[in-house]
Amino acid sequence: MNCHKRSNGKNRDSYGSSVAHKALTKEVVAQRLALPNGPEHMMHYASEAFPFAYELFSEGNSAACAFLCRCAKQEKYARQLNDIMGSEREALRNALLSSQPKLRKNAAVLMGQLKVPSDVKYLKQALSVEDTRFVRPSMLLSLGSIGGDEAKAALVSYTVQPALSEEERVHFEAETEAYKTAMRSFLTFEKHEFTALNRPCEIELRSPDKLSDPLARELAEHGFRVSAVHRSDVHVHTEDMMGLFACRCFTEALIEISANSNPDPKSMGIKAKSFLEKLLPACHTGKPPFGYRLEIRGEGNIDRLAIARRMIAVMDGETLLNCPNNYEVEIRVEIGGNGGAFMYAKLLTIKDERFSYRVSALPASMHPATAAAILKYAEFFLGGKDARVLDPCCGSGTFLIEREKLYPCAGLTGVDISNKAIDIARSNAEAAGSIAKFVHNDCMRFTAERPYDELVANLPFGNRVGSHRSNEKLYAGILENLPKWLRRGGVAILYTMEYTLLKKLIREHPGLRLVTEVRTEAGGLMPAIFVIKIGQ
């Protein structure tokens, strides 16, 4: 097995470490958003920054609108934005008619992300009076994204004005491409079903940071030969694509197109086109074309739009069509710090039903793959089958459900102070066919009728508690209760953002033995996993 840390520059930047412990305020969020790539970097703190960003957006802050556009790609934030704005959508309409071209552009993008049919009339009105060419493509694309008869009629009646000068030619080409892409949204593609890979491919499985070893172990247990292990991904060379989804410790599976190659857009487009024209028809039912979406990631000064245009110009044809509002394949380009490009295909035709039990979630809910990977990391310290397990801060129930997926349990109990959390946890447990039971209570008041074998907890932090001082009180109370909740020799697995605090408190409890720990990285934060045994 080839185990090493990748040095291609794909690791996250150091932005997060400089503000990880600085409380966010409206002023801090405004300052950070104004920095180069500010909206992208603030996604590390999305849940904390979101309310401040919306307030700034309502005041006409273009960077805040760009940040909300990124948030709206996630369903929970899109739903939250639509709830906040209601049917009047005054803030969005005002932004669309602002005197700032960038704000108008970002507002149009946000409308496209939110996909509310009633916004079409505002986009039509704004497009009819828009005199800044670089803004129009976003309005056209959003009409295509929202869809419907009214949007289609608006696009059919629209004419891209010719370039009046050489300087306008770039904007003319961008507007023309946006118009074509928007119109493609109304094409009826034949829906394809994934059958199987027709040949072995290099598959990169993304794991939570520093939890790639548990994933590699899980893959080996399912008969896969691991070819490489990096800090946050594992590689396998296989044609059994569907078999990979028996494993739970990864967030996504990417088929590698090329690795550390020339980042020239034309060269990348040719490679992606050649690779996918052979792969897609061979492993799907139905005939081409396949709609795709191009995602370009990377640090530093990267002109994503220019790269995308040049790649699309090469790739589009009988087999592939750029259709970001109606796609079955995501073509992902990740440009590393050393300049090398990594290209992947993510097939949305593959139905990943591993976590389909998660019918609802809370804003701070842990990703199920993270819960699965943490449990796999601590597997050798767990009680195995027939253990009784407690989660005193259960939230949506993910940790308990994933514990039961690892090994059958004799009992699972979740406690949470939030009625909403308990309702969500019960719904998820029912969908999972879990035996878990949930209790609405303050965990500090919860008493165990008889000691449990294991405890798992994603400890609250930040706005979920209120302050560092509140964390200190809560964490001290939980550690004080561990010997009451767990039998002697029992195990507690704690996941927390408060590494220093929790480690200090553990030292102050001689009846608790720290067995192992690991610090990871998640969205710019530095969570830690602690495995504790009760009794020396």
Which residues does each PLM region occupy?
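Nucleic-acid modification enzymes, centered on SAM-dependent nucleic-acid methyltransferases
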Residues: 287-373
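Class I S-adenosyl-L-methionine-dependent methyltransferase catalytic core
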Residues: 2-221, 336-536
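Non-catalytic nucleic-acid substrate-recognition regions in nucleic-acid-modifying enzymes
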Residues: 160-163, 186-324
